[in-house]
Amino acid sequence: MKHRSLPLTAALAVAALGLTACGDSGSGGSSSYTVGINQLISHPALDGAAEGFKEAFTDAGLDVTFEEQNAQGEQATVTSIASTFANDGDVDLVAAIATPAAQGTASAVKDKPVVFMAVTDPKGAELVASDEAPGGNVTGVSDRNPVKEQLQLLKDVKPDATTVGIVYNSGEANSKVQVDQAKEAGKELGLEVKEATITNSSEVQQGVQSLSGVDGIYVPTDNAVVSALETVVGYGKEQRVPVISADIDSVERGALGTYGIDYKAHGKQAGEMAVKILKDGAKPAELPVGYADPANLQLVLNPTAAEAYGVEIPAELKDRADQLVEG
């Protein structure tokens, strides 16, 4: 397996020169492949997904060159990367990590397979016609998470909590879906949701400060916010307000806990779909969108963080945890 991470300008130059040697995309007959990876931004959850995706090819014994590009959170860069991959005849398949990256890639890449991961609502993001029958050249794995169970953690550690704050990027469709789910779950749990919208990670500090007075903070799988999680965690500890996350990696970075998916396993599931497309000739249009097996969801708690937030995790909850993180 080979990894090639070209500077974006160099990659664009290659495309502009028209160096488009024909690949053998999806035929199942090629002995080696080139896979482009369009990742929205770097943070542990998305990096874990990328790692798991590549691991699937190792396990399958395929000879693959990965061309990895990171848009650093810039949608214009997502589009440029996607266009480069679309015009590069050597690229057999494109992987897209996170909803904005998947949307930009699907818009630009029409004649080769696209496999997404870290996308909460594929149909709502207009990536597929339906989960069961995607219908085009795009399929992948959703990271839809159990929002109600995650918010329940706040009630478990702070039973008198009545409000929860959520900072999210208004430009990320996946985040809006989770906020709507949080509002519905909040009605059942007795939690009023207070929102603060941002447009990029540099606004997270201002956004979280606008949530003054809430009893807890919920961090959805919003890439702008997760990439600046330490800002949210720092505010939570300063104000003694517990921070609950939607992803496991954020617990290791200081959130109190979550009930969520393993992003490396999530990425590997997407990688296995890509292997089916390249090695076996499977058609994305006929590969149903994948979801995490509920049995594989993990309860991960950080008792040290809980203490910093001024709350204690009940012993019964600790006993049920799949993992206790210290730090």
Regions flagged by a language model, labelled:
Residues V35, Q39, F53, T139-G186, ...:
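An alpha-beta-alpha
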Residues G23-S25:
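Bacterial signal peptide processing site
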Residues P122-T163, D262-A282:
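Hydrophobic alpha-helical segments within soluble ligand-binding/sensing domains
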Residues E68-A129, D222-K237, V241:
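Beta-alpha junction/loop-to-helix N-cap segments that form part of ligand/metal-binding clefts
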Residues S32-K54, A60, E67-T77, G171-S175, ...:
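Extracytoplasmic "Venus flytrap"
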Residues K276-G327:
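Hinge/cleft segment of the Venus flytrap/periplasmic-binding protein
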Residues A173-D247:
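Pocket-lining segment of extracytoplasmic ligand-binding domains
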Residues G18-A21:
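C-terminal motif of bacterial Sec signal peptides marking the signal peptidase cleavage site
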